Every structure is written in structure tokens, then in C-alpha cells.
């Protein structure tokens, strides 16, 4: 099938309508403010990008502490809105300790009798200043949970409805200003079940709107985490003019009020973890038309946090520094004293740093449209590495969202994918990628579960394809196939990625939490990957036995060990493996320095054939063969 060039689909990007993330919050979310620098990406099928960002995240939990927040839900197992809020904040604290302990968190109450803040505003109490999360801070939050916590809170702080939300926002702004370190993101999360706090005081309502506008102008994001209340929570009464709505969100879609911890945590995590672009670049539809996009990881493998080296005498963190010395004289070498070299034809070819950078530079970063193909032409075996996600970046080029939406809608309508040449950043080789369109999805509470945009699927080069020799198997007959179909049908279930947690990671995090909070023993993580054998047996009934009778011989015993079949000529088996490469070809490879073109398997067989050591890395095999043939 011929490739479509930029025709009807491409021209449709000139007219469009507007449009509306979830990311993993483990590892790599909280670097030091000193760690400035460009984002860098590892290449390769198993590579996971490791990026550095300047500044720290900061988050203030602004909690309504009025009496209404302490009234229990009717016919609900959950306690009060305040209890649910404190549990949610505690969960964020523990996750931050694990994933990004350099971030700054704070808890501020309003609507109470007592007050404690730098400006001495009435009925506003700063429980915790902006600081790193830690065990002591979590234990302090735990004091105010449950029935005993509510009693302690009432006795310690009391309640008073004569507060000013504008002054509460002002107090939060002062907390950000008092921080000495550099802040990359500043966010306030407001927890309340009161949808019109200043219904009878227009002056306070006006002050709150003014302060919210000031926060917006200074780059502070205000998010509303509204909680369930009798009669429902109406955002339009007051908070629609107060809260921030991100540029990539639909003004008409707001999440429903939260009456359960699970729903509240889902909203908080979606807001708390900022959308970090792996790169921001242009997508060129042709040489004269382009728009800017951001590239993101929707899913990234979670790792255990890196261990920190400590000095054994004081338990203080230590920093590792690397120095390069001359092997002959022992003198210290500066970066300008070293070069990179490539062995080719038994010669070391040295290159300057500028030359190596020039060799790696193919073109300027960006996505360059090649054409369009039907979605049906993308096959499962084209997968070569994890995909990325593309979303418009309006802040760089005005009008990018409009062009992006037009392209997305037209690709969805025609069921096509866009093929592009993709260079993520300088000094990375180009890749051929497919842009797969995706519609936006929201759940019953109008929380986004799938963002609109394009998945970037990396396609293999011709060099990446392998020819695998498959041994011929005994084909199954129709009766055996039908019986297996029945087994598969009985064991089918709806798969959801968020239903299975990594048991090793979960247990590791629980162990860390137990150590940090001085627990007697860590909570045991449930391994959700273990098959439910009893449920499977109940579903299958006699199908397994019937399948065994169809496939295995009558005297088959699964516990018995299969006897090794002896073949004629085993005693005369060759000790050395046969190799398909002639000695002359090997000499040519050695002389030209091109042994690296051979696979590791071929190199190992060749080494064994000539009685050389066949273990170790590929370079060691190449060195052994080079030394062997150079001496003959």
C-alpha cells in the first residue's frame, strides 16, 4: 500500500476546536535545587530516562477545620471529611518520603479558634511550615485522626467560622516567600466541604478572589479538593472564580465531590504530580508549517530508590568524586588531557571531544512528518521499546493546541497513524516513529483517566529484525484446540494495570515506612501476581483432566522426569562446535577491526572452536580472537 502524503489530513489542521494525567510518582521526582542541567535520555530497548530538574516542588495543604468538616457521613463507613483529609495528607507524606524527600510540604488549618502565622491572621493556624517530609511530621498528623484525634483537635484548636479565606491564601503565600531554597513548582491544595464560605460577607468574598488572582499572577497554583456535603457541592457559587484551571483542561469538566478516600486520593495524585515533559520540540508538517509539542512518559518502570552512601563515623551522606590519572606517571589528568578512541583495523583512532559530538549530531531535535498509514498496518511485533506520549505545548508556539487538535481529530476520524522522523534531543540518533491517536476518557466522577493526544510508538529498523529458527512442533488436532479454547474462556478476566502492584517494591516501601515511623514490624504487602488457584480450579471443573486425556499418553506422570533420548553417534559427538565463518573471513575481520559486527553467540562459538576462553563480555571475546590471529 502506498503511503499517503500530507493531503486532506494535513490541510484539516487549519480548523479545529478546543480539547482537555496521570504519571508515576515513584523515583526521580525530587532532585536537589543544585542539580540544574539539561534533561538527558538513555537510548536502548531497556533504557529508562533519568532527568534532572532545577528547584524543588512545594505543596501546601490548606484544610478547612470548621465544625462541618467534623460531622460524620451518613450511611458511610468512612468517618468525617476531616479524617479523610488527614489520611489523604498522610498518604502523600509517606509517598513523598519514598519518592522525593527533597520536596517541601506544609499543613495549614483555617476556621479554628486559635491562630499561628507570621502575619497574625485570626483563625488561621500553620501546623507545619514548608519543609521536607519526615517521620516526626507524620506522627504529628496522626495525633488528629480518629475519635481521639477529633477530641484532641477540638480541645487544642477549637472551631470558629469567622475566618477569611483570602487571609488564609495570603498566609500560604507568605510561607512560599519565606523559603530560602529555589522552588520550581508552588501549589496549594484546598480541602473543604463548604461551597460558599462567604455567602453573607461580600468584602471577604472579594478579598478571597483578589488573593486568588495574586497567587495566579505569581505562579502559585490553587487546586480545590472539594468533599461531599449534604445537598451536593456547587462549585459555581464561589470557587469557580477562585481555583486554577490548567490550560490543558476543559473548563466545563470538573471532578465530582469526594465522599471516599480512594476517590480523594485519585484526585490528589493527579494534581500533586506535575506533568513533566521529557522534551519540548516542534512537529513539522512541512518546511513552512509546524507547532510545538511536549513529550511525556505516561508509564515508566518504578525502581527502588537509590541507596545513599554514609560515612560510618557520623552517618553523614558522602559524595563520590572521580579522578583520572596517567597509568604510567600517576599524574592527575584534566578533562582536556583525555581523548576518546575507536579501535579499527588494529589501530587506535583518537578523536577530540568536538569531533565525537559532531559524529553523534544528525539533525536538530524535532518530529518531521513523513506521511500517514492505516492503523491496521501497525503490528504487535513492531514493538521495540516503551512508548511515549505527545501533547500540545501552547506556551512555546501560540496556536499549537488548535493545530494539534485538528490533526488528532482527523487521524481519529480516518483511523490513520502519522509516521515521523523523531530526534528527541541533540546528539541522539533519529528514529522512525508512529503517532497513534487517542481520545480523552473520563470516569463517572469526571476525573480524566486517559488524556487526548498521540502515543509515540518506536518502530524497528531493518537491522533490528531477527530471523529466529523455530523447531517444528507436533500440530494439535481440532478437538484439543477446542478444549483449550474452553479453558481459556473460563479463565478470562478484565485486566487493569492499576490492579497489580510490584510486590518487591511494595514490601520495600513498607519496610522503609516501618523504620521511619518506628513501627514494631512492617506491614506485609500482598502479592497480587500470585494466581488464585482455588478460584481457577472451581471455574475449570473437569476441563483440565479432559484436556490431559486428549493430549498426554495414559501412563503420563507430570512428576516423573523425562528420560534423555540417546541418539546414534553421541559418543562420537564433536567436542568443538562447528562454525560457519571461514578462517580467511576471520582474519579479514581482525585486520579490518570489524569483529564487532559478529553476534556474541558467533564469537563464543569461534572462541570455543580455537580453544580460547569463551566467557565474558563481547569486547573480551573480540580481544581474545584479535590476539590469537595477530600472533599467527
Curated annotation (Swiss-Prot):
Residues 283-490 form the Ku domain. PROSITE patterns: SAP. It is found in: Nucleus; Chromosome. GO terms for cellular component: chromosome; Ku70:Ku80 complex; nonhomologous end joining complex; nucleoplasm; ribonucleoprotein complex. The keyword ATP-binding applies. The keyword Transcription applies. GO terms for biological process: cellular response to gamma radiation; DNA recombination; double-strand break repair via nonhomologous end joining; negative regulation of DNA-templated transcription; telomere maintenance. Its EC number is 3.6.4.-, 4.2.99.-. Keywords: Activator, ATP-binding, Chromosome, DNA damage, DNA recombination, DNA repair, DNA-binding, Helicase, Hydrolase, Lyase, Multifunctional enzyme, Nucleotide-binding, Nucleus, Phosphoprotein, Transcription, Transcription regulation. Belongs to the ku70 family. Single-stranded DNA-dependent ATP-dependent helicase that plays a key role in DNA non-homologous end joining (NHEJ) by recruiting DNA-PK to DNA. Required for double-strand break repair and V(D)J recombination. Also has a role in chromosome translocation. Has a role in chromosome translocation. The DNA helicase II complex binds preferentially to fork-like ends of double-stranded DNA in a cell cycle-dependent manner. It works in the 3'-5' direction. This is X-ray repair cross-complementing protein 5. The gene is XRCC6.
Amino acid at each position: 500500500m502506498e503511503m499517503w502524503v500530507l493531503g486532506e489530513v494535513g490541510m484539516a489542521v487549519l480548523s479545529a476546536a478546543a480539547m482537555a494525567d496521570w504519571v508515576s510518582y515513584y523515583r526521580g521526582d525530587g532532585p536537589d535545587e543544585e542539580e540544574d542541567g539539561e534533561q538527558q535520555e538513555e537510548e536502548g530497548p531497556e533504557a529508562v530516562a533519568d532527568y534532572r530538574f532545577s528547584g524543588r516542588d512545594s505543596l501546601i495543604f490548606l484544610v478547612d477545620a470548621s465544625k462541618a468538616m467534623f460531622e460524620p457521613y451518613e450511611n458511610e463507613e468512612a468517618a468525617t471529611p476531616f479524617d479523610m483529609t488527614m489520611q489523604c495528607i498522610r498518604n502523600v507524606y509517606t509517598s513523598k518520603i519514598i519518592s522525593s524527600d527533597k520536596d517541601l510540604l506544609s499543613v495549614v488549618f483555617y476556621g479554628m479558634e486559635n491562630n499561628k502565622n507570621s502575619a497574625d491572621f485570626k483563625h488561621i493556624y500553620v501546623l507545619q511550615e514548608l519543609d521536607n517530609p519526615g517521620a516526626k511530621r507524620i506522627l504529628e498528623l496522626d495525633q488528629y485522626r480518629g475519635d481521639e484525634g477529633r477530641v484532641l483537635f477540638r480541645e487544642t484548636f477549637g472551631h470558629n467560622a469567622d475566618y477569611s479565606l483570602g487571609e488564609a491564601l495570603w498566609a500560604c503565600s507568605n510561607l512560599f516567600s519565606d523559603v530560602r531554597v529555589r522552588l520550581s513548582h508552588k501549589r496549594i491544595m484546598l480541602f473543604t466541604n463548604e461551597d460558599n464560605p462567604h455567602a453573607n460577607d461580600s468584602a471577604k468574598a472579594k478579598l478571597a478572589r483578589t488573593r486568588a488572582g495574586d497567587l495566579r499572577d505569581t505562579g502559585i497554583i490553587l487546586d480545590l479538593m472539594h468533599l461531599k456535603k449534604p445537598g451536593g457541592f456547587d462549585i459555581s457559587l464561589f470557587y469557580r472564580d477562585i481555583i486554577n484551571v490548567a490550560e490543558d483542561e476543559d473548563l466545563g469538566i470538573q471532578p465530582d465531590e469526594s465522599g471516599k478516600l480512594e476517590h480523594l486520593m485519585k484526585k490528589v495524585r493527579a494534581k500533586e504530580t506535575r506533568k513533566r515533559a521529557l522534551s519540548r520540540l516542534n512537529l513539522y508538517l512541512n518546511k513552512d508549517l509546524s507547532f510545538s509539542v511536549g513529550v511525556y512518559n505516561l508509564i515508566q518502570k518504578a525502581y527502588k530508590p537509590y541507596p545513599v552512601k554514609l560515612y560510618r563515623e557520623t552517618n553523614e551522606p558522602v559524595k563520590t568524586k572521580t579522578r583520572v590519572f596517567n597509568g604510567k606517571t600517576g599524574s592527575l589528568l584534566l578533562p582536556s588531557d583525555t581523548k576518546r578512541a575507536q579501535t579499527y583495523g588494529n589501530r587506535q583512532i583518537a578523536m577530540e571531544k568536538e569531533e565525537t559530538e559532531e559524529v553523534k549530531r544528525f539533525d536538530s531535535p524535532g518530529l518531521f512528518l513523513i506521511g500517514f498509514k492505516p492503523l491496521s498496518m501497525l503490528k504487535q511485533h513492531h514493538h521495540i521499546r516503551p512508548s511515549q506520549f505527545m501533547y500540545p505545548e501552547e506556551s512555546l508556539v501560540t496556536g499549537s493546541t488548535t493545530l494539534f487538535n485538528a490533526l488528532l481529530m482527523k487521524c481519529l476520524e480516518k483511523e490513520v497513524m502519522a509516521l515521523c522522523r523523531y530526534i528527541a534531543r541533540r546528539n541522539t540518533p533519529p528514529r522512525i516513529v508512529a503517532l497513534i491517536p487517542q481520545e480523552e476518557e473520563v470516569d463517572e466522577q469526571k476525573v480524566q483517566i486517559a488524556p487526548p493526544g498521540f502515543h509515540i510508538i518506536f518502530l524497528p529498523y531493518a537491522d533490528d529484525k531477527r530471523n529466529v529458527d523455530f523447531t517444528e512442533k507436533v500440530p494439535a488436532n481440532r478437538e484439543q484446540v477446542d478444549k483449550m479454547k474452553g479453558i481459556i474462556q473460563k479463565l478470562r478476566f478484565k485486566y487493569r494495570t492499576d490492579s497489580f502492584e510490584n510486590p518487591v517494591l511494595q514490601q520495600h516501601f513498607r519496610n522503609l515506612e516501618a523504620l521511619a515511623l518506628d513501627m514494631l514490624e512492617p506491614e506485609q504487602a500482598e502479592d497480587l501476581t500470585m494466581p488464585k488457584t482455588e478460584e481457577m480450579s472451581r471455574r475449570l471443573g473437569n476441563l483440565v483432566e479432559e484436556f490431559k486425556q486428549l493430549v498426554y499418553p495414559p501412563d503420563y506422570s507430570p512428576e516423573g522426569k523425562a528420560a534423555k533420548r540417546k541418539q546414534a553417534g553421541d559418543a562420537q559427538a564433536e567436542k568443538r562446535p562447528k562454525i560457519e565463518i571461514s578462517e580467511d573471513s576471520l582474519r579479514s575481520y581482525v585486520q579490518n577491526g570489524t569483529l564487532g559486527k559478529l553476534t556474541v553467540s558467533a564469537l563464543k562459538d569461534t572462541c570455543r572452536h580455537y580453544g580460547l576462553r569463551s566467557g565474558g563480555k563481547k569486547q573480551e571475546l573480540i580481544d581474545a580472537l584479535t590476539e590469537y590471529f595477530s600472533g599467527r
